[in-house]
Amino acid sequence: MQSKFIVIEGLDGAGKSTAISFVRKYLEKNNLAAIYTREPGGTKIAEELRNLVLHNKYDEEIHSDSELLMIYAGRVQHYRNLIAPALEKGINVVSDRFYWSSMAYQGGGRGVELSKIRALNDNFLNGCEPDLVIYLDIDPILGLQRAQKVGSPDRIEKAGLEFFNRTRNVFKDLVKDSDNAIEIDAAKSIQEVEKQIYLILDKHFNFQN
């Protein structure tokens, strides 16, 4: 079976970590090898860039274009050093976020032109597209309430409600325009989200469990 690149997307507080735990449980049950990673981050250098983007400790504003480029510098490291090699070896890759998050957060939220982001993906990631995107949709108010229960808000989580409304709108547009993305209502119970994820994976891997 050809290796798969599966990405979980969604706003902060949508439950991506929980969703990934369900994906892990499913793949392990079916004896499918996989690595589990995240963005921003995924490699040592990418994690350093993540920390700078989310927890800027300097008395200097990060321009929206700079934010995008720092995230993409980390993404290139992540893709070249972890994602692509694993897929080439026949190992499935499951990632908490990929380039859709830049389209939504930096494009929708910050207002960076989407064409710039697509160009980065085409030029530096060989136009890499996930085999499956599971998008967890949630109202930004509920998502931020959930995120605040986990810990102190990071730099992006402090961006405000309108920022997250714009981000959500781009996510939903991406799902509509994609042939390999499925939206799940993340406001539903954990049990219902788990059930839907298993059904999606059954169909994707042609399994009947």
Swiss-Prot record:
Family annotation (CDD domains): TMPK
Enzyme Commission number(s) from the entry: 2.7.4.9
Reactions the enzyme catalyzes: dTMP + ATP = dTDP + ADP
GO biological process: one example: dTTP biosynthetic process
Top class in the EC scheme: transferase
Pfam families: Thymidylate_kin
SUPFAM superfamilies registered for this protein in UniProt: P-loop containing nucleoside triphosphate hydrolases
Coiled coil residues, start to end: none
Binding site for ATP: 10-17
Taxonomy, superkingdom: Bacteria
Transmembrane residue ranges: none
GO molecular function annotation: ATP binding; dTMP kinase activity
GO cellular component annotations of the record: cytosol
Keywords of this entry: ATP-binding, Kinase, Nucleotide biosynthesis, Nucleotide-binding, Transferase
Homology family: Belongs to the thymidylate kinase family.
Protein role: Phosphorylation of dTMP to form dTDP in both de novo and salvage pathways of dTTP synthesis.
HAMAP family: Thymidylate_kinase
Name the UniProt record assigns to this protein: Thymidylate kinase
Species in which this protein is naturally found: Francisella tularensis subsp. novicida (strain U112)
Gene name for this UniProt entry: tmk
